[in-house]
A protein has these predicted regions:
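A glycine/serine/threonine-rich, flexible loop-to-helix segment
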Residues: 5, 180, 190-215, 256-286
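Short, small/polar-rich loop/turn modules that mediate ligand/substrate recognition or access, typified
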Residues: 94, 179, 184, 242-244
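Catalytic loop of short-chain dehydrogenase/reductase
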Residues: 144-166, 171-180, 193, 253
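C-terminal substrate-recognition "lid" of short-chain dehydrogenase/reductases
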Residues: 125, 220-249, 254
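Alpha-helical segment proximal to the catalytic Tyr-Lys
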Residues: 133, 176-180, 240
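Substrate-binding pocket helix/loop in short-chain dehydrogenase/reductase
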Residues: 104-105, 112-117, 212
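Conserved glycine-rich cofactor-binding loop
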Residues: 16, 23-25
Length: 286
């Protein structure tokens, strides 16, 4: 059963697109949609086994995998060179890899802080820079960075909030500095998404993850497909005049978080979009 994309077949025919963190969650879902739309895919991440499983799901044809620590400049260069040796070009890049853990600022060690900043901000910089220098500076392309909402602070994840703020500012800056090369760069800012990553959070966070939908105007969690669709749009020719934006896909949570004066009534009028036949609801939300 193939991915049920809302975009036209063959949209990315002849294009090579890199997806970091492509072995699970949002990266896996995005990879499936891009493959359905004709892209040649390069999946890059830390764990080869995860990448290989997704490659098997997609079919071996036109799929390349490369395991690398994206916080390491030498490994990033090797990964980009590997993709170019395989595919000969890089038309699109999805910086989806990341990682964090819940903790209050007073409890975060320097090593923990540095690890989260490196996972979510430094890796985005390194991969984007090397893709730009090795291909896009002379050939153009599109980059989408997957982030998180940080504008109102991120209590319980201050390290992640700081990193994501820097990641979005990098998007804004690069969209100006690299525009002359025909490179567009944008961010997608997911809200609370029912992705497999939720199951990695400790049990003490489960009630918050389940109950947060009460604060979301659409009164539900988002789906992986709803994030993938935003990424696909920003990579596509339809977004040819779109650069330097942070596109929120959060069911209205950000705007509602600015005010405590209005309580959205409970409802079930927001119907989710799910085009991914292999998607499963995280256990924590069952």
């Amino acid at each position: 059963m193939s991915y049920r994309s809302v975009f036209r077949p063959g949209l990315f025919e002849g294009q090579t697109i890199v997806v970091t963190g492509g072995g699970s969650g949002l990266g896996r879902c995005t990879a499936h949609e891009l493959k359905t739309l004709g892209a040649r895919l390069a999946l890059v991440g830390r764990t080869q086994d995860k990448l290989d499983r997704v490659k098997e799901e997609l079919g071996d044809k036109d799929v390349f995998t490369f395991a690398a620590d994206l916080r390491d400049e030498i490994q990033v260069r090797a990964a980009v060179d590997g993709v170019l040796a395989w595919g000969g070009r890089i038309d699109g890049l999805v910086n989806n890899a990341g990682g964090q853990f819940p903790a209050q600022l007073k409890d975060i060690s320097l090593n923990g802080w540095n690890a989260v900043v490196a996972n979510n901000m430094t890796a985005t910089f390194l991969v984007s820079k090397e893709v730009y220098l090795r291909w896009m500076e002379n050939n153009g392309g599109a980059i989408v960075n997957v982030g998180a909402d940080w504008e109102l602070g991120m209590p319980g994840m201050g390290h992640n909030g700081a990193a994501r703020a820097g990641q979005v500012n990098f998007t804004y800056t690069a969209s100006i500095e690299w525009a002359h090369a025909g490179v567009r760069i944008n961010s997608v800012i997911p809200g609370f998404i029912a992705s497999s990553g939720l199951d990695r959070y400790p049990e003490r966070a489960h009630d918050v993850l389940r109950n947060v939908k009460g604060r979301i105007p659409m009164k539900r969690h988002g789906t992986e497909s709803e994030i993938a669709g935003a990424i696909v749009y920003l990579l596509s020719e339809a977004a040819a005049y779109v650069t330097g934006i942070a596109l929120r896909v959060d069911g209205g949570l950000h705007n509602n978080g600015k005010s405590n004066f209005y309580e959205v009534p409970d409802h079930d009028r927001s119907k989710p979009y799910n085009g991914f036949p292999l998607y499963r609801i995280p256990k924590v939300l069952e």
